């Protein structure tokens, strides 16, 4: 097994692109291990409905990235207090779905620090009832990776805020995340532990006393990783557009009237829109409903679709920004 450095990159779109690139393009006769740390971001499972997993208003206000990964499972929050690890190897027939095989050295490293960690259920590492690590896998032909999070010292308030869904009724066939009590590993340590030291302890558990052999990515590798990031992980189509069909319902009682929004959304675009309420406006809201059909379901695109319409004409004295926020 060889170790791959990510050059301390914290851009989640690059780190996920690097992981996929290594899986699909590096020499298959080798196995690889890598770490990466992301700036504040939500990493959504491959089969999830992104809008159902995130508090979009909050993450927009706090510049939190949302990126879809190629493995299944639920949405997770990453920040610089969270260490991600990934084993990339062949599926020998006994590896895919075998979370114990890949989490065992991680659990051993934690136990060496006095943390009473164990693999529980299908894919979580816990201390008692508290989850400190979630794991997921993906397989491409005969190659696979098993990757996971290690919450050393994450901002737990942000974990709750960023993953709290907006107060909308969204019904879809996406895979919903299961929320558990989460905790930082630091809570179970007697002394502070820096992430760089944590990395060394894990590497020693995996490689033993032998020198850690490193596989260095070339300039060409990094160019290809950047291209994959641009073409896939930085696109709305990948991160949001893969959403299954869903029904969006939201309502709010403003000082000047009640407004209810109902959208049918498919692959991120509004297919059908209805607006109800007891507001006092002159215009026929059918104009707005028609303007919204085909629009991407997010604040920016709804704002653009309605840019030529005077919403006061339709809703009376209700704030334009608040109306568009309600729709998104």
Swiss-Prot record:
<comment type="pathway">
    <text>Protein modification; protein lipoylation via exogenous pathway; protein N(6)-(lipoyl)lysine from lipoate: step 2/2.</text>
</comment>
<dbReference type="GO" id="GO:0017118">
    <property type="term" value="F:lipoyltransferase activity"/>
</dbReference>
<dbReference type="Pfam" id="PF21948">
    <property type="entry name" value="LplA-B_cat"/>
</dbReference>
<dbReference type="InterPro" id="IPR019491">
    <property type="entry name" value="Lipoate_protein_ligase_C"/>
</dbReference>
<keyword id="KW-0067">ATP-binding</keyword>
<protein>
    <recommendedName>
        <fullName>Lipoate--protein ligase 1</fullName>
        <ecNumber>6.3.1.20</ecNumber>
    </recommendedName>
</protein>
<dbReference type="InterPro" id="IPR045864">
    <property type="entry name" value="aa-tRNA-synth_II/BPL/LPL"/>
</dbReference>
<comment type="pathway">
    <text>Protein modification; protein lipoylation via exogenous pathway; protein N(6)-(lipoyl)lysine from lipoate: step 1/2.</text>
</comment>
<dbReference type="InterPro" id="IPR004143">
    <property type="entry name" value="BPL_LPL_catalytic"/>
</dbReference>
<feature type="binding site">
    <location>
        <begin position="74"/>
        <end position="77"/>
    </location>
    <ligand>
        <name>ATP</name>
    </ligand>
</feature>
<feature type="binding site">
    <location>
        <position position="131"/>
    </location>
    <ligand>
        <name>(R)-lipoate</name>
    </ligand>
</feature>
<comment type="function">
    <text>Catalyzes the lipoylation of proteins, such as GcvH (SAV0833) and GcvH-L (SAV0324), likely via the ATP-dependent activation of lipoate to lipoyl-AMP and the transfer of the activated lipoyl onto the lipoyl domain of the target protein.</text>
</comment>
<dbReference type="InterPro" id="IPR004562">
    <property type="entry name" value="LipoylTrfase_LipoateP_Ligase"/>
</dbReference>
<keyword id="KW-0436">Ligase</keyword>
<dbReference type="GO" id="GO:0005524">
    <property type="term" value="F:ATP binding"/>
</dbReference>
<dbReference type="Pfam" id="PF10437">
    <property type="entry name" value="Lip_prot_lig_C"/>
</dbReference>
<dbReference type="GO" id="GO:0009249">
    <property type="term" value="P:protein lipoylation"/>
</dbReference>
<dbReference type="GO" id="GO:0005737">
    <property type="term" value="C:cytoplasm"/>
</dbReference>
<feature type="domain" description="BPL/LPL catalytic">
    <location>
        <begin position="27"/>
        <end position="214"/>
    </location>
</feature>
<dbReference type="GO" id="GO:0016979">
    <property type="term" value="F:lipoate-protein ligase activity"/>
</dbReference>
<feature type="binding site">
    <location>
        <position position="131"/>
    </location>
    <ligand>
        <name>ATP</name>
    </ligand>
</feature>
<feature type="binding site">
    <location>
        <position position="69"/>
    </location>
    <ligand>
        <name>ATP</name>
    </ligand>
</feature>
<keyword id="KW-0547">Nucleotide-binding</keyword>
């Amino acid at each position: 097994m060889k170790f791959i450095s990510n050059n301390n990159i914290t851009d989640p779109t690059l780190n996920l692109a690097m992981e996929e690139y290594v899986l699909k393009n590096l020499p298959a006769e080798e196995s690889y291990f890598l770490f990466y740390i992301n700036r504040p971001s939500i990493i959504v499972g491959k089969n999830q409905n992104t809008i159902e997993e995130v508090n979009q208003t909050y993450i927009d206000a706090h510049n939190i990235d949302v990126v879809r990964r190629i493995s299944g499972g639920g949405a997770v929050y990453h920040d610089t207090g969270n260490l991600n690890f990934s084993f990339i190897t062949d599926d020998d027939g006994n590896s895919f779905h075998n979370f114990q095989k890949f989490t065992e050295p991680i659990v051993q490293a934690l136990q060496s620090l006095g943390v009473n960690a164990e693999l529980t259920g299908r894919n979580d590492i816990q201390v008692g009832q508290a989850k400190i690590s979630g794991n997921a896998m993906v397989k491409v032909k005969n190659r696979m990776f098993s990757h996971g999070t290690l919450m050393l010292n994450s901002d737990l308030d942000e974990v709750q805020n960023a993953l709290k869904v907006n107060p909308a009724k969204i019904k879809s066939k996406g895979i919903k995340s299961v929320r558990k009590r989460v905790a930082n590993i630091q809570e179970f340590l007697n002394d502070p532990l820096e992430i760089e030291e944590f990395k060394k302890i894990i590497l020693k558990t995996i490689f033993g006393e032998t020198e850690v052999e490193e596989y260095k990515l070339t300039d060409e590798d990094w160019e290809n990783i950047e291209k994959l990031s641009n073409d896939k992980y930085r696109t709305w189509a990948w991160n949001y557009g893969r959403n299954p069909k869903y029904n969006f319902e939201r309502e709010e009682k403003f000082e000047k009237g009640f407004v209810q929004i109902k959208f049918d959304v498919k692959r991120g675009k509004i297919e059908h829109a209805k607006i109800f309420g007891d507001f006092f406006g002159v215009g026929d809201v059918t104009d707005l409903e028609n303007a919204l059909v085909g629009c991407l379901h997010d604040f920016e695109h709804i704002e653009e679709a309605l840019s030529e319409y005077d919403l006061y004409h339709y809703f009376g004295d209700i704030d334009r920004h608040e109306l568009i926020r309600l729709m998104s």
